[in-house]
Amino acid sequence: MSFNKVPNIPGAPALSALLKVSVIGGLGVYALTNSLYNVDGGHRAVMFNRLTGIKEKVYPEGTHFMVPWFERPIIYDVRARPYLVESTTGSHDLQMVKIGLRVLTRPMGDRLPQIYRTLGENYSERVLPSIIHETLKAVVAQYNASQLITQREAVSREIRKILTERASNFDIALDDVSITTLTFGKEFTAAIEAKQVAAQEAERAKFIVEKAEQDRRSAVIRAQGEAKSAQLIGQAIANNQAFITLRKIEAAREIAQTIAQSANKVYLSSNDLLLNLQEMNLEPKK
């Protein structure tokens, strides 16, 4: 069969040219689309090149260009994130302590290429658990169990200092370190509760003693006042019998007021109200 005898199709060259343009255009759009990548807010990127490896440049937020097939961006979140760890260890006086720690951690932005080379993308899971557990064991072992309670702030500062130094060796920054929980064994907890009860009982006994002392002093002062009052009354009676008469009149007034306010009816002599007022001697003693 001879292909020279195949008739020419009208418009075939134009169709072929259009197909070529479409293919080239599609490849161009695909290449352009795969040549751009975005770095979101709070993130940074490093570039891996198949020929040269990791580049030293750190790419900030925004849209950036890369060579498809040859380059691949690795994007890191550089915002501080909380990391929680609980560890059980022994104190200086051999008490078991369960301590919880919360750290705010982030990668150092200018050290991302080195972080990727040595630790990869899951840097926090590879570094933080080990250095946190080791630091907690080392610091807690320096304190007695009671000191961990009374000197909690100092313990937290020491843990933060050591952790910050150790994390910086792996290009990781720690913005905050705080102790969240501190739990002791049953025996130590029972001893603490018993000590608190004893302290409360001691305070209560001290209060009772102080109150008894105050009552004693009040009784002495009251007795001294009554003795002085009796002495003054005796002197007044000795000097003037009218003092007794005055006291009788005051007593009669109180009796009359009480009877007047009472619901019961009482009949008394209007002359002396049963107090022999008419027989009173108002003349001063000579």
UniProtKB/Swiss-Prot annotation:
SMART domains: PHB. Residues 1-13 are mitochondrial matrix. Mostly expressed in proliferative tissues, including vasculature, shoot and root apical tissues. InterPro entries: Band_7, Band_7/SPFH_dom_sf, Prohibitin. The chain crosses the membrane at residues 14-32. Disulfide bonds: none annotated. Residues 33-286 are mitochondrial intermembrane. Belongs to the prohibitin family. This is Prohibitin-2, mitochondrial. It comes from Arabidopsis thaliana.
